[in-house]
């Protein structure tokens, strides 16, 4: 079993564990937890099965075999998601879901820099039969080190825990912008659904949100999210800042594919921004996305985000709300321990 990684030939596990800033709360990934054992996968993907769900977790290498035919390089996360023995992958087979897509600071940069998570090498780590991680060493441009844990729970829900440490002072606007994309394979509807209201309204109801084209009315923020992010006028990622007129009330949304609801749920304290594109994965293949912003970041400090993805039979919005309740409750009660560095207590 591999007990810790090396950077430049220097063991860093003990150094990080003894850091008063980083050791204030239990680590949930191998990023700063030297006691967490793992093995490095011999292949570019690992299959997780539990409940009625099969999830294939892949690094960002290209794969073309019987399990992942034609999977393109650059797309990491859940390369295949199936439920109940169905043959159809709910995600676009050549792409992925919960794919770590962008690192940015609001400044205009070349495409390869804004898509750096696609290009920097990822190591696939196996924790146990139900848990794997994608580790990415400090990236060449941004210097962001990260570990993404995918754990399949008893009912087949995927819990994703992302931990990162900025290793260099590279984010010129003082914040870190992170973006995850899920490319959905030919759903009946391109819409996503959440509880919220229009900006000018006072009553909360179910919202059926669509985007007329890529980058238009793309992002929905929380009712109380009044944060303003400095950015260049020619910043090229059109999904990031182009907001809709909707505000969500609960950190949750879902879309429907093959009579199944894909339910994305988040911790309230992570202040996630919901995003969507009608054509992110090609014609008829929408992208159902989310963003996490880390304000006033500190070099060497650990930041953490937790979310869950559930696949349940779709009847109507209320049935999805009821079925997802235990997971939403668990995320809401996942209180940040005193001293744990997160986006909220780093301001």
Please name every model-derived segment.
Residues 8-17:
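Bacterial N-terminal signal peptides
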Residues 17, 21-25:
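Boundary at the C-terminal end of the N-terminal hydrophobic targeting segment
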Residues 36-117:
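Acidic-aromatic substrate-binding/catalytic surfaces of carbohydrate-active enzymes
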Residues 196-240:
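Low-complexity, serine/threonine/proline-enriched polar segments
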